[in-house]
């Protein structure tokens, strides 16, 4: 489908239709959902840390524990509100710390565990037992374990949630085809943390989050709102800064999805965040202004704040059903455009981007479905070499 066949007014009509709905639906989150409050946040962070210090850790439950930690940062009331606002019928289970006794080698031992419906006390105890084995090994090797290598380091939970931020961007594929990219990116941005913790295995943790988001889609809504809240909070640790960068890259693509002229209002579509618009600068400006009307939380976050940074490579999106707004801006410059732009900043950013693409020689004109007039306009504005124009 050519980009020029998609009309913005179709999108606006659908937006009006969706906005006029008088009814809502209720989804079920299951029998019970654990909603931990701030008071158990430290314990959940420590549980994350136990998994991180455990050599060859079993990360089957890491995604779930990471999400419980995220909820504890939001707080019980806000977590429940997020779920209800998203249309979920919530049966909330409060979470407390309790003492659990277990016989180990003929000796009764006491453990502090959380009253979770989603994670048994036995599993929590097993995580602690395995982490103690690794901790003893660390003591032998180091003599003394520095705070940043311990299981109770305050950034343990956020380290795990950094991988969740990478996974959330890949859910749109409907499978786990993005896993390789997640692993590669995690190995890069979390390289210092990987040196700290032998149990920080990006592949296993990413698979655990894939599992959680696939089985419990309501947690996607929770995570997105957590990410917004976390990223908008000033200060914080180095890892919190890394998380904000990773999450905003995903969120910035646009929570409101314009795809094949259809508007999908759902936080689950942030990772799809692609705009298909008419290949004319006028249309691009209309979409830009439409995004401004909806506001930052409705999507296009980074486009509203930094248009130039949003202009991604056209060659990454050969299918016109997935051209991001910034690409459309660039295409508007390369295509035929007459008149004075209504948004000079956006026009200048798009023009600079298009010219940079030309200078780097990475524009593949064969995927643009350009008319003869548009090709002529490209020659006039960008002066490409003949061999750059592939038909």
Curated annotation (Swiss-Prot):
Function description: Encapsidates the viral RNA genome by forming a left-handed helical nucleocapsid that protects the RNA from nucleases. RNA replication depends on the availability of soluble nucleoprotein. The encapsidated genomic RNA is termed the NC and serves as template for transcription and replication. Together with the phosphoprotein, sequesters host NF-kappa-B in inclusion bodies (IBs) thereby inhibiting this host defense pathway. May also act as a modulator of the innate immune response by sequestration of host IFIH1/MDA5 and MAVS into IBs.
Principal subcellular localisation of the protein: virion
Chain residue ranges for the region called Interaction with the phosphoprotein: 31-252, 244-290, 338-364
Keyword RNA-binding: yes
Taxonomic classification: Viruses, Riboviria, Orthornavirae, Negarnaviricota, Haploviricotina
GO terms of biological process kind: symbiont-mediated suppression of host cytoplasmic pattern recognition receptor signaling pathway via inhibition of MAVS activity; symbiont-mediated suppression of host cytoplasmic pattern recognition receptor signaling pathway via inhibition of MDA-5 activity; symbiont-mediated suppression of host NF-kappaB cascade; symbiont-mediated suppression of host PKR/eIFalpha signaling; symbiont-mediated suppression of host type I interferon-mediated signaling pathway
Keyword Ribonucleoprotein: yes
The family this protein is said to belong to: Belongs to the paramyxoviruses nucleocapsid family.
Domain of life, source organism: Viruses
UniProt modified residues of type Phosphotyrosine: 38
Compartments, as annotated in UniProt: Virion; Host cytoplasm
Keywords carried by this UniProt record: Capsid protein, Helical capsid protein, Host cytoplasm, Host-virus interaction, Inhibition of host innate immune response by virus, Inhibition of host interferon signaling pathway by virus, Inhibition of host MAVS by virus, Inhibition of host MDA5 by virus, Inhibition of host NF-kappa-B by virus, Inhibition of host PKR by virus, Inhibition of host RLR pathway by virus, Interferon antiviral system evasion, Phosphoprotein, Ribonucleoprotein, RNA-binding, Viral immunoevasion, Viral nucleoprotein, Virion
GO molecular function list: protein serine/threonine kinase inhibitor activity; RNA binding
GO cellular component, one term: ribonucleoprotein complex
Subunit description: Homomultimerizes to form the nucleocapsid. Binds to viral genomic RNA. Interacts (via N-terminus) with the phosphoprotein P (via C-terminus); the phosphorylated phosphoprotein P binds to N-RNA complex. When in a monomeric RNA-free form, interacts with the phosphoprotein (via N-terminus). Interacts with protein M2-1; this interaction allows the association of nucleocapsid with the matrix protein. Interacts with host EIF2AK2/PKR; this interaction inhibits EIF2AK2 phosphorylation of EIF2S1 and blocks EIF2AK2-mediated translation shutoff.
Protein name per the record: Nucleoprotein
UniProt PTM comment: Tyrosine phosphorylation modulates viral transcription and replication.
């Amino acid at each position: 489908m050519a980009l020029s066949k998609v009309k913005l007014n179709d999108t606006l009509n659908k937006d009006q239709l969706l906005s006029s709905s008088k009814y809502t639906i209720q989804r079920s989150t299951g029998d019970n959902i654990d909603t931990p409050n701030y008071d158990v946040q430290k314990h959940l962070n420590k549980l994350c840390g136990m998994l991180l210090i455990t050599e060859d850790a079993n990360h089957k439950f890491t995604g779930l524990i990471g999400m419980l930690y995220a909820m504890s940062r939001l707080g019980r009331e806000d977590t429940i509100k997020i779920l209800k606002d998203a249309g979920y019928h919530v049966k909330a289970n409060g979470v407390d710390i309790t003492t659990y006794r277990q016989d180990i080698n003929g000796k009764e031992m006491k453990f502090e565990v959380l009253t979770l419906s989603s994670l048994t006390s036995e599993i929590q105890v097993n995580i602690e037992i395995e982490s103690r084995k690794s901790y003893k090994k660390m003591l032998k090797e180091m003599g003394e374990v520095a705070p940043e290598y311990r299981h109770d380091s305050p950034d343990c939970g956020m380290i795990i949630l950094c991988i969740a931020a990478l996974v959330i961007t890949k859910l749109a594929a409907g499978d786990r085809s993005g896993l390789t990219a997640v692993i590669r990116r995690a190995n890069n941005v979390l390289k210092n943390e990987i040196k700290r913790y032998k149990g920080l295995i990006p592949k296993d943790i990413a698979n655990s989050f894939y599992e959680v988001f696939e089985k419990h889609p309501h947690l996607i809504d929770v995570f997105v709102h957590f990410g917004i809240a976390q990223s908008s909070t000033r200060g914080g640790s180095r890892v919190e800064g890394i998380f904000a960068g990773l999450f905003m890259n995903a969120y910035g693509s646009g929570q409101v999805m314009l795809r094949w002229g259809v508007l999908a209002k759902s936080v689950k579509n942030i990772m799809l965040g692609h705009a298909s618009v008419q290949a004319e600068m006028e249309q691009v400006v209309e979409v830009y202004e439409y995004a401004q009307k909806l506001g930052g939380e409705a999507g296009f976050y980074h486009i509203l704040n930094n248009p130039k940074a949003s202009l991604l490579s056209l060659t990454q999106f050969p299918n016109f059903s997935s051209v991001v707004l910034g690409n459309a801006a660039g295409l508007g410059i390369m295509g035929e455009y007459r008149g004075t732009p209504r948004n000079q900043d956006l026009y200048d950013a798009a023009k600079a981007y298009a010219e940079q693409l030309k200078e780097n020689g990475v524009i593949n004109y064969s995927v643009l479905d350009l008319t003869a007039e548009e090709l002529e306009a490209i020659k006039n504005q960008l002066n490409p070499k003949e061999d750059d124009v592939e038909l």
